Amino acid sequence: MTNTEIIATMSRCVCGTRIRWTQNQDNNMHRGVVDEFYPQNGAEDAYLAVIEPERYIPVLSASEIQKISILEDQHHNA
């Protein structure tokens, strides 16, 4: 995926959106729930705050992601 495609997918995420992604440094598929999306801001890359089953990832930047997809288009009310 291109960086533009990754950011476009990230921008569709809201709190509770379930996603899966592959990071550049590994080939493992990760799954988690989005906590918040932060758009690109000047020199700062767009990023997501994500909750995985075993950990919280406060910054998952677009440049770290190789491939991302939304598992569902609905979000869950917390």
Regions found by a protein language model. Name each.
Residues 5, 20-22, 69:
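Residue-level detector of intrinsically disordered/flexible regions characterized by low predicted structural confidence
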